[in-house]
């Protein structure tokens, strides 16, 4: 079975850009385990996933110029080799993410931890780019989620009276030629173990390319047990990163945001669509950028980003970021309601300019348009 696909670059250059096609699920698809995308340039595997009456086909657009149109053929397959794809492997209380047998990241979920987090996070040169529990801030856990005032409970720090984020169960673990995905349920609790709210975390690790790789990170918070106030504090982030010491501004690295702000002086407490942190690691320039989704509350986010290595998307700390403006950043979730925060993390080679971080953000918020023809 084959379909024709037409992809339109639109007003932007595209490079290693994820594209997903959604079709109504039909019984004739039940024996298909994968798909292949054919074009004049060659062929590539696509990832197929079924979900609630639909079927999703995902692949990567290698390169398209502004205004370009490309035609592809989609062919479903009954069998797909997993040799060169993404894989998930369990190591006690960690889920390892691998590509072609090489580790990219590990999701740490032990219930003894203060919070689940991702560490290590391997950069495009094969070296970890994040720090886990540095001495100056032991609660900074590589790539993590936390908030310092949840109905008055500190779920940011790691002290005796701090709250915690506790792993409950995995809802989904899947891997294929294009991405691996972890979906997990966590419960935020106070220091007595009493539940504050429920969290669904969805993390998609995209196949590495020659420019680096993407990680899509989505957090949904539900006020299951009562009304929730996420208080006004700078010690919070629905996505936070702590880079390795050698990447920090203090060691010669740089922070750049979407408005051209440079380093902490021009980016801390400022709003921006994205923020990038890069520097030299073992003789090679690498970086990590966070892209804020346009669908997120209070987009574009404020940034709690420091020359010593912290980068956090924080929409809450307005009394700190907007001193004297009479503004507060408290965020209320009424009982039974849910709020979602989505980000793309771009782990890249080179500087902000070298990696064309701004163009890759456009791929995230304004992806190419796709037509499917039977």
Where are the predicted features?
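Short, hydrophobic/aromatic-enriched beta-strand segments in well-ordered soluble domains
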Residues: 69-78, 184-186, 201, 217, ...
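An acidic-aromatic substrate-binding cleft motif
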Residues: 83-108
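Short, well-ordered beta-strand segments enriched in hydrophobic/aromatic residues
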Residues: 5-7, 97-101, 215-223
């Amino acid at each position: 079975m084959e379909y024709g696909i037409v992809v339109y670059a639109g007003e932007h250059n595209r490079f290693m850009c994820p594209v997903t096609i959604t079709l109504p699920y039909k019984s004739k698809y039940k024996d298909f385990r994968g798909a292949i995308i054919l074009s004049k340039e060659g062929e590539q595997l696509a990832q197929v996933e079924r979900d609630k009456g639909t079927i999703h086909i995902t692949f990567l657009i290698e390169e398209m110029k502004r205004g370009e149109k490309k035609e592809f053929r989609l062919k479903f397959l009954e069998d797909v080799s997993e040799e060169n794809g993404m894989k998930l492997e369990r190591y006690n209380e960690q889920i390892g993410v691998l590509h072609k047998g090489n580790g990219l990241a590990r999701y740490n979920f032990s219930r003894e931890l203060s919070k689940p987090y991702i560490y290590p996070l391997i950069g495009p040169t094969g070296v970890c780019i994040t720090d886990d529990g540095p001495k100056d801030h032991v609660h900074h856990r590589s790539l993590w989620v936390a908030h310092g005032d949840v109905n008055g409970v500190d779920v940011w720090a790691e002290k005796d009276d701090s709250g915690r984020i506790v792993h409950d169960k995995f809802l989904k673990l899947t891997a294929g030629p294009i991405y691996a995905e972890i979906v997990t349920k966590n419960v935020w609790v106070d220091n007595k173990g009493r539940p504050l709210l429920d969290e669904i975390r969805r993390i998609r690790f995209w196949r590495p390319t020659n420019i680096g790789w993407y990680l899509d990170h989505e957090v949904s918070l539900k006020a299951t047990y009562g009304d929730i106030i996420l208080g006004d504090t700078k010690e919070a982030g629905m996505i936070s990163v702590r880079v390795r010491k050698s990447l920090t501004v203090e060691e010669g690295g740089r922070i750049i945001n979407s408005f051209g702000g440079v380093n902490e002086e021009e980016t801390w407490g400022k709003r921006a669509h994205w923020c990038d942190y890069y520097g030299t690691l073992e003789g090679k320039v690498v970086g990590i950028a966070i892209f804020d989704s346009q669908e997120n509350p209070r987009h574009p986010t404020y940034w709690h980003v420091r020359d010593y290595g912290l980068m956090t998307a924080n929409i809450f700390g307005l009394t700190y970021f907007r001193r004297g403006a009479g503004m507060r950043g408290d965020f209320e979730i009424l009982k039974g309601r849910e709020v979602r925060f989505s980000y793309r993390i771009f782990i890249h080679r080179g500087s902000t300019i070298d990696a064309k971080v701004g163009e890759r953000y456009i791929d995230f918020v304004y992806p190419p348009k796709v037509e499917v023809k039977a």
